[in-house]
Amino acid sequence: MHEHQRFDEAAATWDDDPGHEKRQVAVARAIKEAVTLSPRMRVIDVGGGTGRLSILLADLVGSVVVTDPSAGMVRVAQERIEVAGLSDRLRAVQADLTTDRLDGAYDVAWSSMAFHHVQDLDGLLRSVAGLLVDGGRLAIADLDEDPDGAFHADKVDFEGHHGFDRQRLAEQLTRAGFTDVSFSDATTILKDDREFGLFLCTATKAPSPTGRAPASR
């Protein structure tokens, strides 16, 4: 089964899992501690799923575009946004940022547990860098390196990354045009009686000759 299809089928009940809610609350807290947010900021959520992270942080920024390759996730995200009364500032868009081009210039990009599903990570990082203004901030929450693949052991057709080595990810971010790369521990995930670490990585879009200005703070 293709991953997009799996997420399409899981979307309707995804937020029913208390573990997912606990994780997103922890990631939202970590982002608030690591990134200065303001009401004029334009945000893009990369692989935002049901939009829960963006809904949790919505009151701290100006607008958010929640992107996800899964049509099912995007449909649920838009429903959640409307129920939360946030449709004037948040919207969900089906997009795979490794292949699809989006318009706009964003002050912040955030993501939770999405990057490890992306095979072309370098391509995604370059795409996100291209969407950010100079000085724009990136916040990635994802799995620490899981060498034996235990976290995804129940998915025999998983083709993503088994977590990330922090130093290697920092090098990829630098090559993609980011500076000030920093890591912190965000939370842990308990699965099959094992704990898996979740980091928050933040970075800053380096200035470019054709860069775009950030929103007024």
What feature does the model see in each segment?
Residues 1-38, 52, 76, 83:
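Conserved class I S-adenosyl-L-methionine
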Residues 18-21, 137-202:
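C-terminal alpha-helical "lid/dimerization" subdomain adjacent to the S-adenosyl-L-methionine
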Residues 42, 136-137:
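Short glycine-centered segments of the SAM/dcSAM-binding site in methyltransferase folds
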Residues 44-99:
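Class I SAM-dependent methyltransferase SAM/SAH-binding core
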Residues 86, 118-119, 132-133:
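Helix-to-beta-strand junctions that scaffold the AdoMet/dcAdoMet cofactor pocket
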Residues 110:
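A conserved beta-strand element that flanks and buttresses the S-adenosyl-L-methionine
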Residues 113-114:
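Short catalytic micro-motifs in class I SAM-dependent methyltransferases
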Residues 122-134:
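A short glycine-rich, Lys/Arg-flanked "PGG" loop and its adjoining helix->strand segment in the class I
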